[in-house]
């Protein structure tokens, strides 16, 4: 009897283990504690506003691997491997065709590219890149990890798997993971010719056991957002299927919602469920829908505003969708989307409207993307709304998943002496981390006429910062991966400070600490400057510092920060060129933390 109970218990335990999903992404750099304020003045919430991090909540995002896989100047069938199509040497390419630029140049008679050719709706911040650009993939891994995205879901809905590109992404993610990064897992979404696509995907990726540690598992098995009907038993049993397509209300595919995960839906979105129809499993959140349905980024309260009233960067549609998702509070939020960027040009008359205006056969339309308003990408763009959607997404993710609290201490035990030995920093309580190995050079072909994108701006890999407060001073520590060139404080290394009591100044900061252009003896001076406008700084003092090898320490008298308020935000940035725009934090040199993010420190009330 005891043996029977033991066997039953073991089987029950094994069953429970088999139901486990992949762990949620937990940033080793504690990115969920970082502060940021976007170009619209919207600040990210922290633990006090969203509560503690919930390790049972998941976020996935639609990710696209097709950029360059269907040709450049004209549409082509994929090459046999379904990877990025090599460019022909010596060919005079005309693309990329950017619809927004085409319309700006010839609004009445747009000079589009050929029919069926892929057109960009706008320019990505990292340029018209190809999907196998490792430098871009690394930036995507960093941005999505910092945002708290648990899984990227590759779009293979058009019966093309793009396996070489998926493998390139996994190769980069795996390398970053070995460097100590937390990276999103991967999954796929199928639709057209789903049996053929799933068999190809299974044989080329899963059956071979490739990058198994990157597979996203949902309740015991690798997740496949697709249709299990008609598949061989071996494949049908291998995956946990969740059928996915567009819209829900009155849609036959969605039915009652059991095991259905839509990738786009009208507000208020319906949720998919698994065990119980009263227990939401998944809901979708999208930034917009389609130009041919006239549902853009500004659509809200049930209608699309007239053209002279849209505000594409404000995220009204996205905000409504997040509102619904947070009310439903499912296990999994699926976001559409990250980096689609292109759409085919059609003239066959299948669409009857574009942006609410009637069109007839022979006139141009684009189904999924058209311009800044009628597009769905969250990845930052060049110009336009910049990175607004990236931070709006993070706002929603934090409200859904929560965030870790900041370290608070009445007294920091460390006592700092600027002597270049750095042992006194070992007891510092406030330690801040950045990603290791994120200053690799870029040299990769771009789309069509763009021969190559290059970037060699990275020089000092910023790894760790510390902060110690006393009654009179704030002391900062920085460690880099390698020693500073020449053993001296480099030009271009800057510590930016933002206090909670003053309006933001240049680049959103009130003060900056950097090397002066003046040198006394052999040692460069360190100065603190105050922002006097959005573009101008004025020096207010010189500061003491010590530098040895790959470590730097400096102290700042609180006299220079009058009325700082309750908190301080700070950021280290290093590049050969000056940072003149917050967007340059994305691709110039290295920043700690990344992009617009800042580390946040709660000032000790006993020391204020």
List each language-model region with its residue ranges.
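The substrate-binding groove and active-site-proximal loops of carbohydrate-active enzymes
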Residues: 32-36, 118-133, 149-160, 184-195, ...
